Amino acid sequence: RRAAAPALPVASATFLTTFLDFSDTGVLDVFIDEAFVKLREMQFGQGGLMPGHDLAATFSFLRPNDLVWNYVVGNYLKGETPPPFDLLYWNSDSTNLPGPMYAWYLRNTYLENNLVKPGHARVCGVPVDLGRIDIPVYIYGSREDHIVPVTGAYASTRHLPGAKRFVMGASGHIAGVINPP
């Protein structure tokens, strides 16, 4: 029931639009390579913060027609006030990330996919083995997700030996989670 060191038992786990296996990251593959990760390690690897607004802008530009240009045309060119939209408000409330954690995450997940290699990823010095997580899991993927493609979310099922339920829903990364499937 444990992925690494002894811990309190957990009855089940839920993964909503989440990668465990980073072998199919969709369009993000275009942006994350060795040079990019080294740059981020130099910038943030020893301390500091990854500004949340930078990360939010990255995700917005993965769907520029919907999340950027639509507002440039409406707000800037036409002078229209956008209608209130709870999902976009929530999406704009970004969180800064600890720099060393962000640099570790890029290298160990997106670049090297170490989370699915038993013992290759270490958290607080403890090797992680997803194959030891033998609890029931619920995994949800959104069909139009631009951050975690549904095929990437589904790939997690190969690495968890316990009972699994995978649900594919409609919509995108955020809306798919909060709307019924």
Give a label for each model feature:
Residues 5, 10, 16, 27, ...:
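Gly/Pro-rich cap/lid or specificity-loop segments adjacent to the active site
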Residues 7-12, 83-84, 116-118, 162-169:
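Acidic/polar loop patches that form or flank catalytic/metal-binding clefts of enzymes
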Residues 91-128, 135:
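Mobile cap/lid helix-loop segments that gate and shape the active-site cleft of serine hydrolases
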Residues 133, 139-141, 145:
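Short beta-strand/loop motif that positions the catalytic acidic residue
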Residues 146-152:
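Conserved alpha/beta-hydrolase "acid-adjacent" motif
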Residues 106, 160-181:
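Catalytic histidine neighborhood in serine/cysteine hydrolases
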